Amino acid sequence: MDKADTSAAPVGASSPIPIPIDQPQRSNSQQGSIGNGSGSHRTPGHIPTHRQSFAENLRNPPPSPRAQRHLSLSQSAIQELLLKNPSSKQPNPLFANRDWRDVAVGELVTQDDVKWADLDTSVEEATMLLLRSSPANVVHVREKSTDNTPVSTFDYNDLNAYILVVVGLAHPEDDEQVALYDEIARKARERVAIPLRDIQPICRKEVLVTFSADEPLSRGVEVLGSGIHRVFVTTGNGDVIGVLSQLKVLGFFWEEGVSFPEIDRLYPVPLRDLKLGTHQIIAINADRPLAEALTLMSNEGLTSVAVVDNGMNVVGNISTADVRLLTSAASMPLLESTCMHFISVILTERGVERGQDSFPVFYVNPYSTLAHTVAKLTATQSHRMWVVESPSPSPSVPGTPLLQPVSSASSGQVAGATPTTPATTSTASGTPALSTATSTGSTIVIPSAVPTASLPPPVSSSVPAAALPGAHLSGRLTGVISLTDILNMFARSSGLHPSDPGEQRARRRRSSSASMRPSMEASRPSAEFIRRLG
């Protein structure tokens, strides 16, 4: 956004990310992702020793938030947040009477967002930099320390991919990469420093786009509204001086929208009338193992996934940024715990950091205004909001979800229309099953093709969905609205021509399942992509 003792989920690690012990040899992806087909699967083993985490090295363990708990965002606070529309503010003199399309991208960025690592920097060191990079959530990777031009990046998606390789849940597409994956896991197990250079082939790389600081914001919004998550802003000689991210641009439009009538007039409009978002979503049942959610995000090229109960009601959100809680050996049992349990760990960790509980605010409904949606996105620093309807009152779905396994679907994709033929996959027992509609409507659950039978039982009981703050305030999942969707609409409503975001989404999915080239060329912008935006 997304109970165990907080010591089970420390933030960071002083060793090169958690390592399972006694791992069998890895084989290619034809033998399954999480299942134990032909000995290829390696579940996290017993960790005999515990090395201090990043957090333990940086600060003394804080007192437990259990002693005094209160919601950080009460209903009144949420209402106040949503009523604080910048449209009621006086225009900022810096942007008054200006066309937002003529604002220079350099006016929105700061040098503080730029964190550097070299290709020879260890994954451990890069992870520490990443944990400190908020709100940019990215580390720039350069060839050598004297360079000021990135050749790659390191973000939470890459950290997730690395952890999946280390614990044996990621599988290469060909025999050539089998040796690479095994070598990375071996070095991590032996606590040998692994340079970022070595993990480039396993990381899914987005196109690297750079703009000069004097480029107009219209160009930046066209690119970001086409599905690119960030743009590097450079000086005339090519040195990076800032990062223009989707979230930064949306925050700018939220704070300064009163100066731009084309943007400000859209805020009072309901999402239903704007026809924003998509009904094709990927969700996972709350009772499924966390390892399955992480694998699902990696395979599908996602930064977050909705967590739902048996009635398809949204009960939480897990993002790749949450893997920061898995960067120590002691946190490995969390991979075997349920998604619902991990959500409770996320909320507890936020309580430790802030001294109070967090109230999950990660959903909107079709009648929410754009202002309501953007307020939540900027306040929570989220990349998407789940669109929900009223909570499912179906007699077949208890008011307090029991979170028992669903025989027809463990994790899956919510599609916008019922397929003409039933989708076949495997249940938790490994036998074929047909996906069935969760209601009489058109939304169905398509089970994941990722088998989960080999994962051990959760190490602790799942926290009931009804026990979490806000559990009764969400509703049935029907869609999703992303930063890309909103920026794409802003661009089109202002006469710009962004590319179809679906192209970038498809590219991320392809690059997640295909063998990655071990070179920097895969991450450099293609001439064709730049021409389409020009």
UniProtKB/Swiss-Prot annotation:
Entry keyword set: CBS domain, Cytoplasm, Nucleus, Repeat
Which ranges of the sequence are coiled-coil? none
Q: Where is the signal peptide?
A: none
Which PROSITE patterns does the entry mention?
A: CBS (PS51371)
Please report which protein family the annotation says this sequence is part of.
Belongs to the SDS23 family.
In the record, biological process GO terms are: cellular response to glucose starvation; regulation of mitotic metaphase/anaphase transition
Which molecular function terms from Gene Ontology are attached?
Answer: protein serine/threonine phosphatase inhibitor activity
Can you name the source organism?
Pyricularia oryzae (strain 70-15 / ATCC MYA-4617 / FGSC 8958)
Q: Give the InterPro entries listed for this entry.
A: AMPK_gamma/SDS23_families, CBS_dom, CBS_dom_sf, Ssd23
Please name the SMART domains in this protein's record: CBS
Residues annotated as domain CBS: 109-173, 203-262, 277-334
Its GO CC terms are: cytoplasm; nucleus
Q: What does this protein do?
A: Involved in DNA replication and cell separation.
Instruction: Tell me what this protein is called.
Output: Protein SDS23
What residue spans carry the Low complexity bias annotation? 406-438, 512-524
Source species taxonomy:
Eukaryota, Fungi, Dikarya, Ascomycota, Pezizomycotina
Where does the record say this protein resides? Cytoplasm; Nucleus
Stretches for region Disordered = 1-71, 389-438, 494-534
| Pfam families hit by this protein | CBS
Cited PANTHER family: AMP-ACTIVATED PROTEIN KINASE, GAMMA REGULATORY SUBUNIT (PTHR13780), CBS DOMAIN-CONTAINING PROTEIN (PTHR13780:SF36)
